[in-house]
Amino acid sequence: MPSVYEKYQLKPVINASGRMTILGVSTPEQEVVDAVNFGLGHYFEVKDLINKTGAYLAGLLDVEDAVVVSCASAGIAQSVAAMIVRGDPYRLEHLHAHHHEVPSEIVLPKGHNVNFGAPVGTMVNLGGGKVVEAGYANECSPSQLAAAINANTAAILYIKSHHCVQKSILSVAEAAKVAKTHGLPLIVDAAAEEDLRLYYNQGADLVIYSGAKAIEGPTSGLVLGKRQYVEWVKQQANGIGRAMKVGKEGILGLTHAIERYLAKEKESGAAMVAKMTPFIERLNQLPGVTAKV
Ligand SMILES: *Cc1c(COP(=O)(O)O)cnc(C)c1O
């Protein structure tokens, strides 16, 4: 078989940038690839597969429930839809058909209304929500967040990311307090973050992760959180979620990748330098090239 790079005339990539969507994000380890392959090679009762892998992950992470989705963006859209539909069978099937007389505004700090490769607002709109910005581009306090809430608010959205403004923006714990005071759910997009328990423990009701970034799983996403909300996210499989379906291979691959990720020691700086050193030494043998850690 000719190399894929030759067959399609692709440029070979040495990824020195980390987990970038534009470069193919990550290359899962063999055990994860095996889990993906097992998924591809077998049949399952898919609802059972979704529920039981979700419950297994929830047990590993010590959260109420979890569900594997097709990617973090799909997780945002389906979480928003979940908070608008809230299990109503008519709204589930007619989300975009017309206006529904239920809260649909999603409040987020203005400094979090970013483009992570696609706009956060587009994912909110896909989920049937309307973005309401709180505070200013460079500032959002708990009271500024609260000021944007009204009777039409469905949820608060918090984006935990290097893409966002970091200074003078309230913390996840503070946002959770505002949400609780107003009886609203807090959704946290932690797509590229490394700690799978932190934001849940800080009071978020739903937390969303990208499967191929820190976790180094297949293309997929994880939504974890409070049982009722996760249940409503799962129901979106019969609504907008169908257009962003995750396959059995993605479900089994991510579940195994998370198990491996949690068991793995975090790589130390010294270990990274040790791994880099032979590569750097060989680069330095190339004429005209100077490289250092
Ligand atoms: C990468 C990223 C996403 C999208 O994740 P996908 O799994 O590629 O959909 C969403 N939000 C943030 C902050 C991200 O960094």
PLM features per residue range, with description:
Residues 42-49:
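N-terminal glycine-/serine-/threonine-rich phosphate-binding loop
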Residues 268-275:
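Shared catalytic-loop signature of beta/alpha-barrel
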Residues 291-293:
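Conserved PLP-binding catalytic core of the aspartate aminotransferase-like
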Residues 2-27, 49-57, 62-262, 269, ...:
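Conserved PLP-enzyme active-site core in the AAT-like
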Residues 30:
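Metal- or metallocofactor-binding catalytic centers and their adjacent structured scaffolds
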